Amino acid sequence: MCIRDSKRGVPSVITRPPYAQTGDPGPSILPLVRTSDEIASMRKAGAIAAEVLLHVGENVTPGITTDKLDQIAHDEIVRLGAYPSPLNYRGFPKSVCTSVNEVVCHGIPDSRQLQDGDIINIDVTVYFEGVHGDTSVTFYVGEVDEHSKHLVQITREALYKGMDTVKNGSRVCDIGKAIEKHAHSNQLSVVREFIGHGVGPEFHSALAIPHYFDRRATTELTTGMSFTIEPMLNLGGNTLHMWDDTWTVVTTDGRRSAQFEHTLVVTEDGFEIMTKTSSGTIPSEYFAN
């Protein structure tokens, strides 16, 4: 049986998102296009999220618990003056999500020890200067099998295939089309129930980014829009099951799942990655192997 510790504290001097006390983010009501000041703050929030993900990733080793990884992330987030966005978002009890092997997303850190050969996605989001920065990487734990390496590598590539379609005037459906094509050509399935989303002053804003081709997703991307792309690909089928904790989502067939994520802002001729460190290091590339 895995044990979950209680929520971690955040110093009172750190600015909290509106939902921090109640857990209720309310409806998404803000514009999809960011101001120049908001984009400047998103660079800072994204840089913190990337720094934290790099720091946590260096601690992914056999024997460590996912709760310890959560503690490492939490301590680094607050040290850098930010708030861990998942904490109490709709009641989520931890500061990051840790999704191991067949867990697709929203795994809750607990006393589970990582084993040699596991894979783990760590999803870090921070709130800083009134905006969120959201990013994730799937890590190898020790030596993993070739099927898992294939899954992780193709999922990383699929993220970048989707990103490469982003520019002013392109359509949301172009992102999913590119991701789905790359996944299927490499014999992987695409999760449909969980998608990318608008992000900025709100953790999840109204813009929806499917990771599969959806001809209804005709929204035209406009300079200044900010959102995540975060494909989840599976070795087996794409049917899912949610645990009784109402957060943890797993593959129905028990096969492994991987995910990578960046926060982007649309530019006139492409995009800018928000979730890179102040020195330009991008976690999804730093840990590529």
Describe these PLM feature segments.
Residues R4-N289:
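Active-site neighborhoods and metal-handling regions in enzymes and metal-associated proteins
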